[in-house]
């Protein structure tokens, strides 16, 4: 077992920053656990908000953009905390990034970030999920649906099954899953549609400066933009050639 710990104190000047914490994952690692804890959680009537984004040696591995002052992430070959992708843990440099969405003026925020890596037999990785067949209603007309929804993969309490059941109960024709800054639930939601309910994926770009939806894809979209840049316009322009909606 390998353990590593980071800790620091932040002030309001550190609000709206991406703080990378780099660590090495050795070959043969079967499970990783990343724990973020911080205090104080509340300042007056407002909460501080620190979230996690994880990158493995190949790129984006998941994110947990949700409330609370304790975030525990487990990633293994066969399972992962919602918001993160299961699968092999490639050897090399990983990054646990703390996204400081809100740090209130006044009392500083102290955080600790603990990394625990365990060796062992590699669990089988879930097979890619095929997309469900499209809805039988494909002609022009009026359709009832929802372009914006969340699950336990970000900051909602409902599972994907519960979301889809609610959509059917309300008589929707289609629904898009758009969790905050992660795509970990998209394969599942797309596979669970049927002829009566079209299910599709997307992502809500929950930036420090505003929110936007990218609909129709499975790939993660880098939401880390700088104020005053044209990054959002570039994301929109890059979406259209891939038949995505922005």
Predicted regions and their residues:
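Solvent-exposed, flexible loop/coil segments flanking beta-strands in beta-rich domains
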Residues: 1-42, 114-121, 128, 132-140
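Surface-exposed beta-strand/loop patches in noncatalytic accessory domains
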Residues: 2-14, 38-81
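Short structured motifs
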Residues: 18-21, 79-83
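Noncatalytic modules at the cell exterior or secretory-pathway interfaces
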Residues: 28-36, 85-110
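Edge beta-strands of jelly-roll/beta-sandwich modules across compartments, strongly enriched
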Residues: 46, 104-117
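Solvent-exposed strand-loop boundary residues in beta-sheet-rich modules
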Residues: 56-58, 119, 218
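Surface-exposed loop/turn motifs at beta-strand-loop junctions within extracellular Ig-like
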Residues: 100-102, 117, 203
């Amino acid at each position: 077992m390998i353990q590593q710990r980071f800790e620091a104190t932040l002030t309001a000047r550190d609000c709206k920053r991406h703080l990378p914490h780099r660590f090495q994952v050795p070959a043969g690692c079967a499970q990783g656990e990343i724990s973020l804890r911080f205090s104080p959680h509340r300042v007056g009537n407002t909460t501080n908000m620190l979230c996690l984004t994880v990158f493995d040696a190949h790129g984006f591995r998941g994110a947990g953009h949700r409330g609370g002052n304790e975030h525990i992430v487990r990633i293994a070959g066969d399972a992962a905390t919602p918001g993160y992708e299961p699968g092999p843990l490639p050897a090399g440099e990983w990054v646990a990034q703390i996204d400081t969405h809100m740090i209130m003026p006044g009392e500083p925020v102290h955080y600790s970030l603990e990394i625990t890596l365990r060796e062992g037999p590699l669990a089988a990785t879930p097979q890619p999920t095929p997309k469900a067949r499209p809805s039988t209603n494909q002609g022009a007309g009026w359709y009832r649906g929802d372009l914006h929804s969340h699950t336990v993969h970000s900051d909602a309490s409902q599972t994907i099954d519960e979301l889809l059941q609610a959509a059917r109960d309300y008589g929707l024709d289609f629904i898009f899953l758009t969790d905050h800054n992660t795509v970990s639930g998209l394969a599942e939601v797309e596979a669970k549609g049927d002829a009566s309910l079209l299910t599709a994926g997307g992502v809500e770009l929950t930036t420090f400066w505003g929110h936007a939806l990218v609909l129709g894809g499975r790939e993660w979209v880098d939401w880390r933009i700088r104020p005053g840049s044209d990054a959002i316009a570039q994301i929109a322009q890059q979406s259209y050639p891939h038949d995505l909606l922005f």
